[in-house]
Each structure stands twice: as C-alpha cells, then as structure tokens.
Amino acid sequence: MAKLPVEKMRELERRFGEIEARMSAGPAADVYVKLASEYSELQPVVTKIRAYEKAIAELADLETLLEDKSVDREMRDLAELELPEVKEQIEALEQEMQILLLPKDAADEKSAILEIRAGTGGSEAALFAGDLFRMYERFSAEKGWKVEVLSASEGEAGGYKEIIATITGRGVFAKLKFESGVHRVQRVPETEAGGRIHTSAATVAVLPEAEEIDIEIRPEDIRIDTMRSSGAGGQHVNTTDSAVRITHLPSGIVVTSSEKSQHQNRAKAMQVLRSRLYDAERQRADSERSADRKSQVGSGDRSERIRTYNFPQGRITDHRINLTLYKLDRMMEGEIEEVVDALMADYQASQLAQLGEQQ
C-alpha cells in the first residue's frame, strides 16, 4: 500500500479550518456559496483524517501502556485486547483515505455531453444506438439528472444514426466517463426470419461539458453556416429551416444543431464544440502525463471495444475488467450502477498502484 501523504493531509486540515473561520465571519453571499461548496467537498476527507489521527494516538497510548512494566496485569490484558481492534481500524481508515486523497479529475463534478453513433450493422446498429440512449436516459432519471437532446438523426427502422444530448447534474462526468468506446450487440433482429444472431455496434463518447472559462474559442477560428434541415420526425427530432453548422477551422471539428430557433442552434452547437475542444485538450494533457495511459480503464479510446451485450444469453461483458453479468434486461432499463462502480473501483486501484510505484 502506498504511504499516506502526511503533508497533504495537514494542508487539507489547515484549509478546512480556514474555511470554517471565514464562513463564521459572515462573508458576502457569493463568497459564502463558494466557501460552502469547498467545505462540503473537504468535510468527508477531513473527518477521515481526524478519525485516523485519533486512532494513531490511541495505538501509541496502548503500546506505551504495554511497555510500562509498572501497569497491573488487568490493564495490560485489556490493552492487548484493544490493540488488534485499533490496528484493524487504522488499516481500514488508511484504505479509505488512499481513495479520498487520490488526485481529483477537475472535470469529475461537471455535467456531460453524450454522443452515440451507430456503427457497423446498418438498421440494427441504429436500433441499438437508440437502446443505449434510452439506457443512459433512464439511468440519468434515476439519478435526478436532466437530459436534453441537442441533435438527433433517426434510423430508417427506428433508433438513431446519431444522437447528441447534454446530461446536466453534479458529478455526471465522473459516473459516465468510462462509457466512452465501442459497444457491441449480439442479438436476433426482429426482421430475421431464420433466427440468426447478428452482430452490430455503436460508438459512445462522453465529454465533460465545458464552460466558457474552460476553453477560449476565438471568433476568427470558427465558420458558421446556416442551412435548411428536415428530419423524419419523432420524439427527439425537430424539423426546421434554421439548422446551424459550426466549423472550428484550426481543428477541423464540425458541429451541427437543428433546433427550431437559429439562436438556440448556435448556442447549442457552440456548447458541443466547446466541450469537444476541451475534451481534446484534456486527452492531450493526459497522454503527456502518462505514457501507458492506453492500458488503463480510463483511457477514453473511442475505437476500443469496451463492452458486449449478448441478448440470447442475457449477458453483458465489460472487456476492460473482465466483468460478466447475467442481468442484461435490467441493465438496458438503466440499472448500470454495478458496472459503473466496478469500472471506477478498477481505475482507482490502478491509480493507487501507480502511486505506490512512485514512492
């Protein structure tokens, strides 16, 4: 196990005390809101640090007592009984704090942009893309997050060739960031008379929703085209004469939005463009920091096949962590917490291993 960063722990305690003092002094409302946010973030960490320090002090007292030959036998027996319990408590607290003190991803608390595109498999791939979108939509509803479709292109037999949506809520990106990659489906299409299993795929990209403060887009770096647009209709598609296409000239990234209002289109297209540029910048920085990033669960490589959904067997397999569950129906209804948590745990374990190698 990696050693706990004692200096960092002391700094967090010092900062927490400073925030408490400033909040008690009655600052301006906007300052108070910022302090309260930082307070709620630090409180669980500092609570564990203080519990750990208390347990360490108890251990020292017990060891001193056991070394003191003048202490009567009954007291020594009690101390010997307590000693393993305190050591066990310290070990558990150390494990919890290893996770709490891991470097935080600055984007984890952000909302997210969800992009799903049908891949190989024609109409069946579009239907599967629709199934995936509904899965994330239901998971989001359970979490109390708001889902808003920015653009959608329906498949001929249903589903989506492409759908882009915002998922708004605290910590959305932290929960969904490991969903990026190729999702493969194996099932018998409804139109298949012979009952043969077909394999098709859809690509998922989850980007942290960027704000203007996160990334600067210069007016001279974009070209905005207005065009006529029409869709097949349906729940998530609007027919409009005011579709907007924004091209970011330096990167070549193109974003299209087709809401009824041209003003809305421009705002939504800029929202997606900003998030894609922010994500590209994050990935560049991550690649520089970690040469072996591709081997990690959180690599975000969208060409990597990450998961298989086998409908005849009712099985879902995440290939990155060799996790197989036989509860496909429930997962397609949005019950993906078990997989999401397993991916996060695996990622944290790899971070801890790297931390241990560095010390």
UniProtKB/Swiss-Prot annotation:
Q: What is its main location?
A: cytoplasm
N5-methylglutamine modification sites are: Q235
Q: Does the keyword rRNA-binding apply?
A: no
Q: Could you tell me the superkingdom of the organism this chain comes from?
A: Bacteria
Cell location: Cytoplasm
Stretches assigned to coiled coil = none
Matching InterPro entries? PCRF, Pep_chain_release_fac_I, Pep_chain_release_fac_I_sf, Prokaryotic/Mito_RF, RF-1
Gene3D superfamilies named among the record's database cross-references:
3.30.160.20, 3.30.70.1660, 6.10.140.1950
Q: What are the alphabetically sorted keywords of the record?
A: Cytoplasm, Methylation, Protein biosynthesis
> Entry's Pfam families?
PCRF, RF-1
Instruction: Mention one GO molecular function.
Output: translation release factor activity, codon specific
**The keyword Protein biosynthesis appears for this protein:** yes
Region (Disordered): which ranges?
280-306
PTM statement from Swiss-Prot or TrEMBL: Methylated by PrmC. Methylation increases the termination efficiency of RF1.
Give Gene Ontology CC terms.
Answer: cytoplasm
Which HAMAP family does the record match to this protein?
A: Rel_fac_1 (MF_00093)
What this chain does, per the entry, is described as:
Peptide chain release factor 1 directs the termination of translation in response to the peptide chain termination codons UAG and UAA.
Q: Which family does it belong to?
A: Belongs to the prokaryotic/mitochondrial release factor family.
What is the name of this protein?
Peptide chain release factor 1
Give the classification, highest ranks: Bacteria, Pseudomonadati, Pseudomonadota, Alphaproteobacteria, Hyphomicrobiales
Gene of this entry: prfA
